[in-house]
């Protein structure tokens, strides 16, 4: 399927890439709003590959339990290489990426970072692995810069390493951030983009002073109504080879809003189902899930951590918070006690935009379920 829209976000990110690296950029938004799709579109179709070489690290591909898993995600091991001197290998890899054919350049687009097996094995035999990892990446990126190519480092779902610790209980995440600050603001060696659907993680990063003045944030949200209706037109032509009437498009939007993945689901099902049946089932499904979630609160006492405190929640307070959305899709985060919204965000019922201080349901579908049930 052809890529649709997002020109505003694409132009912003391309403008950032054209400048000197100075910040770590966090790309955030609600679940399935299209963050990864956007970055892959930029990497594959919008970059000038004569100037840039992107490395795409997807933490969803592995179960990240420790530093070893983190390192395995960062690199693609060159099993054929017998080079154990990382400097020698980095020079040859930089030459390949800069002087190689267009086919080679396209092959490496958006892959993890290549590393020789002997050096990779050597890293795993050390107690402090992160130092060698960072040293290799820094050296490779410096060589690419010398040869006129700017690396772009992309981390997808970075929050998955949040709880991993290094030796001495130091957080891997903050060790990585220090390294990324060195690569961007200090040495200007590469651009860094961190993608996350976990809005509590974005809040955690945003309010922590260690990245003050070193990070910026880009929201990739669900489509607004006008764009959503155009997306419906686009999909109807691509999938159904026809145009939907205005009332049907309005009906689709009223149920699922501008969530791209849900709009795609509706249009695809229209190949073999009636529109009203599709939408009624989707809303019934979302309502049932919300009902079961609330019913469980009659038997459990959920607890959340806020700072060093563990706070027990009451069902009536959770229901009261959800009822605030009966008349508004968005509310200020100050209207809901933090322990309550933390719990509802963790359960993927609400989305928090910490930069704007806004809470809203993860989707129109959940919003409609709230209004129907409460």
UniProtKB/Swiss-Prot annotation:
Q: Does the keyword ATP-binding apply?
A: yes
Q: Which InterPro entries match?
A: Archaeal_ATPase_domain, ATPase_dom, MJ1010-like_2nd, P-loop_NTPase, WH-like_DNA-bd_sf
Q: Which Pfam families match?
A: ATPase_2, MJ1010-like_2nd
Q: What domain of life does the native source organism fall in? A: Archaea
What are the record keywords, sorted?
A: ATP-binding, Nucleotide-binding
Give the molecular function GO annotations. Answer: ATP binding
Which positions in this protein are listed as binding ATP? 29-36
Question: Which family does the entry's similarity section mention?
Answer: Belongs to the archaeal ATPase family.
| Full protein name | Uncharacterized ATP-binding protein MJ1609
Species: Methanocaldococcus jannaschii (strain ATCC 43067 / DSM 2661 / JAL-1 / JCM 10045 / NBRC 100440)
